[in-house]
Amino acid sequence: VASVRIFQRGLAMAFLLVVGGCQSLPDNSGRTMSYTLPNGADTRLGRGVATLRAGQSDASGFYPLSTGVDALVARLQLVQAAEHSIDLQYYIWHRDKTGRLLAAYLLDAADRGVRVRILLDDMGSPLGDESLLMLDQHPNVEVRLFNPLSNRVQRFWSMLTEFSRVNRRM
């Protein structure tokens, strides 16, 4: 009797996995394509970079930031200085102080007329993040998900049934 119940539960679990794997992604065919804006050499940041790069043809352009605080301050300063566009790509965005602070700065930039594009990995993005939902409502902001799960509410099932597809990284 116990082995029959275990078999029935296993069969029910297998059925749920198969049915969950049959779910398709949402239709995005009507969504407007988004492209980067032309080179921003005419902006204050662009001119500053050009001055720093003068005579540095072999420089990589990377400047390591050794602490999280340094990285956050640098991002916030860049957002404040942006004149035309901001393109962000994140694997993880949380509703913590850092996420809310960055969202507030991005909203301020969008209010100034700066186009803000945010690309998030769906695996590292919380469900129903109010700050991201609020940002996405702004006409100058686009929030997009990379590799969206077919069912965001049942992430566990999507990871089990579509692991090879949803486990890719940006």
Predicted regions and their residues:
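A general, composition-driven signal for non-globular sequence regions
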Residues: 2-3, 17, 69, 83
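Gram-negative bacterial Sec-dependent N-terminal signal peptides
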Residues: 9-19
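Phosphate/adenylate-binding glycine loop and adjacent helical scaffold
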Residues: 86
